[in-house]
């Protein structure tokens, strides 16, 4: 039995009197004029015209050694039932791939953390950066700001004239010395504390000197009076 045949029940005509399927011999084996499509019936490849048809038979067999295709009334319902299952399988595959990617990322993170923990930390690595205050070790204290000689000189000049700065003047000095406003504020606070300590020390030193001098004068005066009394007694 030849695999390609002309079914008289599939005879459909177009509006212009043109047949969908031309006169093709029964024993023709060429694929140029008529091409077989397993799921959508026969179609003309030259004009690309696809004709819908209805077959009274429940099962139509195309070719030997092929599976039977059902073109009955329930085929569209079966397709609708198949679509959700296909979507579910696709969603399952996508979730599995997503879980695999997350697992690989977690393994990479844990590997990097283990490598960081295995790195030895030396004392020189724990030193703080004086400008940024960021260190390599576990100690996160801020480093002390180191000012240059020019910066300290300009700040001392400003402090000599003004013990307290306004915000406008502070911004001007910060821009001129390439420092931040906070650094200027902290420097002036520390300088005022130092100045108060120095003034307190000088006042205590001068006070002690004054008290010591007065005591010496009193002792000298007391000694002079005692000597005068002794001389008066001798004269008598």
Swiss-Prot record:
SUPFAM superfamilies in alphabetical order: Homeodomain-like
Presence of keyword DNA-binding: yes
Residue numbers spanned by region Disordered: 198-236
Alphabetical UniProt keywords: Developmental protein, DNA-binding, Homeobox, Nucleus, Transcription, Transcription regulation
Pfam families named among the record's database cross-references: Homeodomain
Short sequence motif named Antp-type hexapeptide, residue ranges: 121-126
Localization per record: Nucleus
Domain of life of the organism encoding this protein: Eukaryota
Molecular function, one GO term: DNA-binding transcription factor activity, RNA polymerase II-specific
Record keyword Zinc present: no
Gene Ontology process terms (BP): anterior/posterior pattern specification
Positions in coiled-coil regions: none
Predominant subcellular localization, coarse grouping: nucleus
Skewed-composition ranges (Polar residues): 200-214
InterPro entries in the record: Antp_homeobox, HD, HD_metazoa, Homeobox_Antennapedia_CS, Homeobox_CS, Homeodomain-like_sf
Function: Sequence-specific transcription factor which is part of a developmental regulatory system that provides cells with specific positional identities on the anterior-posterior axis.
Similarity-based family: Belongs to the Antp homeobox family.
Protein name as it appears in the record: Homeobox protein Hox-C6a
Organism: Takifugu rubripes
